[in-house]
């Protein structure tokens, strides 16, 4: 009785062995879904024994400590569960490593494919851009050459135009001087003509006066001769 009292006091401080067993059984039931082969067979056998004994105790209505046998059984179940968990962990690690390896290979393949595609695309467009830039440089050189030619032609035309303006200015100056000389010569000629005309008129007047005087003298002489002749005829 004393021992049972001690056991009862121990149960009051911790969860009962039945509760521990129930938790272990529930945990085992959840983990058993992921196990395979002999591990599941061992756990299912031990679970069946524990379940059978628990049902006997429940049907008898006797609540007592399972003692060392149940404790050993639970420890065995715990060991089996640990082994199963360890095996599951190893399988999970292997699967994880395999998955990581496969994923790395896929990622590496995808990365390499993308890199090749990017490199191919870069090469293709780089060549196109290079060709376009070369053509652009050629066009720019041609444009600069044409611009230089046009500038040279413009400078030549400007120089020719300046020379033409100088020549035209000189010719215009010559024309102006010639016109002034012409006007001056015309004035002098008109003046000379006036002088000549005046001199001719004066000479003509002098000649007319002399001729008139001569005619008058001849007329007088003729009249005198006629009178003399008449007188002579009358006298003789």
From Swiss-Prot:
The modification Phosphoserine is found at residues 36, 38, 59. One of its GO terms (cellular component) is lateral element. GO terms for molecular function: DNA binding. Residues 52-57, 88-91 are annotated as: Interaction with DNA. Its main location: nucleus. Belongs to the XLR/SYCP3 family. Component of the lateral elements of synaptonemal complexes. Homotetramer; the tetrameric helix bundles assemble end to end into long homopolimeric fibers that exhibit a transversal striation with a periodicity of about 20 nm (in vitro). Interacts with SYCP2. Forms a complex with EWSR1, PRDM9, REC8 and SYCP1; complex formation is dependent of phosphorylated form of REC8 and requires PRDM9 bound to hotspot DNA; EWSR1 joins PRDM9 with the chromosomal axis through REC8. This is Synaptonemal complex protein 3. It comes from Macaca fascicularis (Crab-eating macaque). The lineage of its organism: Eukaryota, Metazoa, Chordata, Craniata, Vertebrata. The gene is SYCP3.
């Amino acid at each position: 009785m004393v021992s049972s009292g001690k056991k009862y006091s121990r149960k009051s401080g911790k969860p009962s062995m039945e509760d521990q067993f129930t938790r272990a059984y529930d945990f085992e039931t959840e983990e058993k879904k992921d196990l395979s082969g002999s591990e599941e067979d061992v756990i299912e056998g031990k679970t069946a024994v524990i379940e059978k004994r628990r049902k006997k105790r429940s049907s008898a209505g006797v609540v007592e400590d399972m003692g060392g046998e149940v404790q050993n059984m639970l420890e065995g179940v715990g060991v089996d569960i640990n082994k199963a968990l360890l095996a599951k962990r190893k399988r999970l690690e292997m699967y994880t490593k395999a998955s990581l390896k496969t994923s790395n290979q896929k990622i590496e393949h995808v990365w390499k494919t993308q890199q090749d595609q990017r490199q191919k695309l870069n090469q293709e467009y780089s060549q196109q851009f290079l060709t376009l830039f070369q053509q652009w440089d050629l066009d720019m050189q041609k444009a600069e050459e044409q611009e230089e030619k046009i500038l040279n032609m413009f400078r030549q035309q400007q120089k020719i135009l300046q020379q033409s303006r100088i020549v035209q200015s000189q010719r215009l100056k010559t024309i102006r001087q010639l016109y002034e000389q012409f006007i001056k010569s015309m004035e002098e000629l008109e003046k000379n003509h006036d002088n000549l005309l005046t001199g001719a008129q004066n000479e003509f007047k002098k000649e007319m006066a002399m001729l008139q005087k001569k005619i008058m003298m001849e007329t007088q002489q003729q009249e005198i001769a006629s009178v003399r002749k008449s007188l002579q005829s009358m006298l003789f």
